[in-house]
Design a protein with these regions (language model features):
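Sec-dependent bacterial lipoprotein signal peptides
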Residues: 1-21
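Short loop/turn and low-complexity linker motifs enriched in small/turn-promoting residues
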Residues: 20-147
C-alpha cells in the first residue's frame, strides 16, 4: 500500500502532461506558406492569439531574431514584413521560453498561432506555425483592431 501513492501520482502527472501538450503535425512546404503577389521583396508573417478564457489577462512579447515584433494579448493579431530570407527563430518567454524556426522565403506568407498553456505561476507561451488554410480561418475570427 505504501507504493500506491507515488505510482498513482506519477501516472496522473503523465496523463495530465500528455493531455496538455500540443499535437504537433508536420507541415509540408505546400501548406506551410502561401505565395504573395509576384515581385514581392518580403515575407509576410501573421501572428495571432485566439480569445480563450485561460490566461486572458496575461500577454507576452513575441520576438523574431533579437527584436520584439508582436505583443500576444488575448484576441489580438499582428503582421510583420520580413525582408531577410532564410531560417529565423521566433520565440517568446514568460516563465519558460518557447521557440520555433520559420524557413522564411521572400514572396511567401506564414501564420503563427500564439497561445498560453498552464504554468506554475503565470503560464507558458506556445508558438505553432499553422497551415495557410487554418491560419486564414482562425485569423478571420479575430477582429481587426481599430486605430
Amino acid at each position: 500500500m505504501r507504493h500506491f501513492y507515488p505510482a498513482f501520482f506519477a501516472a496522473s502527472l503523465a496523463v495530465c502532461c500528455a493531455a496538455c501538450s500540443p499535437k504537433l503535425i508536420p507541415l509540408t512546404t505546400d501548406t506551410a506558406s502561401a505565395a504573395l503577389p509576384a515581385g514581392t521583396s518580403y515575407a509576410l508573417v501573421h501572428f495571432y492569439r485566439p480569445s480563450k478564457l485561460v490566461g486572458f489577462l496575461i500577454g507576452y512579447d513575441v520576438h523574431m531574431g533579437d527584436s520584439v515584433k508582436y505583443r500576444a494579448k488575448d484576441g489580438s493579431r499582428g503582421n510583420v514584413r520580413w525582408v531577410t530570407p532564410g531560417p529565423v527563430t521566433v520565440w517568446a518567454k514568460t516563465e519558460a521560453r518557447e521557440e520555433i524556426t520559420l524557413p522564411v522565403q521572400t514572396g511567401r506568407e506564414y501564420f503563427v498561432r500564439c497561445t498560453l498553456g498552464a504554468g506554475a505561476l503565470m503560464g507558458r507561451p506556445h508558438l505553432q506555425q499553422v497551415s495557410v488554410e487554418q491560419g486564414r480561418k482562425e485569423l478571420a475570427s479575430i477582429p481587426v483592431p481599430s486605430r
